[in-house]
Curated annotation (Swiss-Prot):
Species this chain originates from: Limosilactobacillus fermentum (strain NBRC 3956 / LMG 18251) (Lactobacillus fermentum)
Cellular compartments per GO CC: cytosol
GO biological-process terms attached to the record: 'de novo' IMP biosynthetic process; adenine biosynthetic process
Protein name: Phosphoribosylformylglycinamidine cyclo-ligase
Catalysed reactions, semicolon-separated: 2-formamido-N(1)-(5-O-phospho-beta-D-ribosyl)acetamidine + ATP = 5-amino-1-(5-phospho-beta-D-ribosyl)imidazole + ADP + phosphate + H(+)
Lineage, opening ranks: Bacteria, Bacillati, Bacillota, Bacilli, Lactobacillales
Family matches, as Pfam families: AIRS, AIRS_C
Gene that encodes the chain: purM
Amino acid sequence: MNRYQEAGVDVNAGYELVKRIKENVKSTNRPGALGGIGAFGGLFDLGELKVKHPVLVSGTDGVGTKLLIAKAMDQHDTIGIDVVAMCVNDVLAQGAEPLYFLDYIATGHNDPAKMADIVAGVAEGCRQAGAALIGGETAEMPDMYDQDEYDLAGTVTGVVEKDDLLTSDQPQAGAILLGLASSGIHSNGFSLVRQILFKDHQVDLAATPAKLGGQTVGQAVLAPTKIYVKPVLPLLKDHLVEGVAHITGGGLIENLPRMFGDDLQAQVDSSAWPSLPVFDYLKELGGLSDDDCWQTFNMGLGMILAVQPDLVDQVKSRLNQAGEACYQVGQLVNRPAGEEKIVIK
């Protein structure tokens, strides 16, 4: 053992990790991706793209304290999907096609098997999004983190034709709001989730409450964030959608109004889509108010599209053909003076 290892950093574990992840990283390659693991920087050739006036759209995000659920379950192979989803769904909301992704893992101890599981999830997320995993960093920091702790973040870059960029001035009064089903909690609100499960109660993550329909609590809360790129991007390229909202921290109340201008109001019918069991379970167990839920969780909708009425049937049909559950959840109207930008009924 050398002095660096004595200090808590094992470079050989890093070399072992690179060997383990090489094939997963390679599986994400797409046109434009150059090189492979080992270069000083990730490379992407924009000349491969058929874009006349490209605008690059970048996003960075993490997974938050959902990582502590993964740690408690010792299940690390899906949390990477979450970090990709949080980033790619954000750039999709601007109209952009994800091109490439970079991940960052910080840990107290580089366990190659665990780190490889995390990267396998990142690679799976990249495949779902059509983005190349062109680089990343695993930082072993023994005095910053405990041995079994890690943090995970990522950055995506996407591209959109300048004329196709989605901005808040595009949605118009009369547009119909179509909600796309979430897969569960996604990656926001986990400080409240953990408060309910572990502090207010001592819930066993292996328990199967009746409200969860056969799922364990752990399975329900760790379900990976849905990636909407493949069903939604073709609709954007065909100019069938005039606004997209990614429903993340703050739920519909915070995120839906970001999609449109201050002169409009979103009127949302909360009975228009089915409630997910995980939210019913958390609401009852935690004694949460309706306001608590709407201000914290996605409540079953991970993305909302603004579509003109004459295009709604076509968009719904194409989403259904892509296997995407879609609900007509409301509309945009001219905002009455003094009222909020969103009303949920």
